[in-house]
Amino acid sequence: MQIVEENLRDNEGEIKLIPETLDDLWHLRFIIEKGDVVFATTKRASQSSDKLRSDKEMVTVRLGIEVEKVEFHRFANRLRVSGKIVAGIEESGYHTLNITVGKELSIIKKWKPEQLERLRRAVEDSNRPEIVMLTIEEGYAVAGVLRQWGVEEIFEERMGYGKGMGDSRKEFFGEVAAKLESFDFKYLIVAGPGFAKNDFLDFLKERYPEMAKNAVVVDVSSVGSRGFIEILKRRVVDKIVGEVRLAEEAEYIDRLLEGIAKGERVAYGLDEVREAHNYRAIEVLLVADEFLLEEREKWDVDGLLREVEESGGKVVIMSTEFEPGKRLMSLGGIAALLRFNVKG
């Protein structure tokens, strides 16, 4: 994320920025909210100067809209911001701004501390090296790229049969390596059960030495999404780029589920969390980003977050694009790890 210009007073005002990655669009999904004013260039139909014709030509204009709806279309690589036109060549009607990577926009609003922190983090993360995780076992591999919101699967490969086992295995390794080579990344984590991961790295060292130079091997029990989670838990990512957030989220959910199973020092669901906060018992408050968006329209959920921090608790906003955040949503979207039990 690139901040072009910032004009704030008491956390209120305009920030002009340019999203540089798909991750930046995802961040904006949780920064832009109903009632904000967003400016960006867009295409609008303009009535032809030829009065005898009814056709219209498309012209590029800069419009400002008061936001009513925000949608993140990950697979279309865009953010759709819809609302009432409040500034531009016409100041009536409704329009949808399509925000894409590289497109400048301005956001005018009362900025919440969590939103400014998310923006600052996006700016810092724009220089983070990209990491690819490859989970591999005999005859099967799944690769994913580490995003700011989690791990996005990019391909899977299965070994074909029909040749000798040795030839087929080398061909399989070659196909996996060729697919990896088509992606731009700096670090590679090769993980999985058994010996396939080590043999694959040896293959890379021989055939793709540049790729192998920044590769590490990790032992995990699963291939695919479960394997990705195991990698994060082992803090391999931390050792490479010091990225702790995703690994921490996975650990927090493990602690939460363990506490639920034992009935010790946890609260989940809004009612239990509020009760725990009344006792000032919250050590870590876990909040799903989707829960935050939904509840902000109903009550002052940000007030609860501030109070928890003021009483010495830590607030962690978790992405529902990733498995730990999805699990949290299934538990009500909000939970807490407690300093002490509050139930009898």
From Swiss-Prot:
Cited InterPro entries: eFR1_2_sf, eRF1_1_Pelota, eRF1_2, eRF1_3, Pelota/DOM34_N, Pelota_arc, Ribosomal_eL30-like_sf, Transl-rel_pelota
GO molecular function: endonuclease activity; metal ion binding
Pfam family, one: eRF1_2
Metal-binding among keywords: yes
Gene Ontology biological-process annotations: nonfunctional rRNA decay; nuclear-transcribed mRNA catabolic process, no-go decay; nuclear-transcribed mRNA catabolic process, non-stop decay; ribosome disassembly; RNA surveillance
Keyword annotations: Cytoplasm, Endonuclease, Hydrolase, Metal-binding, Nuclease
EC number: 3.1.-.-
The organism's place on the tree of life at top rank: Archaea
Cofactor: a divalent metal cation
Subcellular location: Cytoplasm
Cellular component annotations (GO), alphabetically ordered: cytoplasm
Function: May function in recognizing stalled ribosomes, interact with stem-loop structures in stalled mRNA molecules, and effect endonucleolytic cleavage of the mRNA. May play a role in the release non-functional ribosomes and degradation of damaged mRNAs. Has endoribonuclease activity.
Domain notes: The N-terminal domain has the RNA-binding Sm fold. It harbors the endoribonuclease activity.
Subunit structure, interactors included: Monomer.
Record-stated family: Belongs to the eukaryotic release factor 1 family. Pelota subfamily.
Protein name: Protein pelota homolog
Organism annotation: Archaeoglobus fulgidus (strain ATCC 49558 / DSM 4304 / JCM 9628 / NBRC 100126 / VC-16)
Name of the gene this protein is made from: pelA
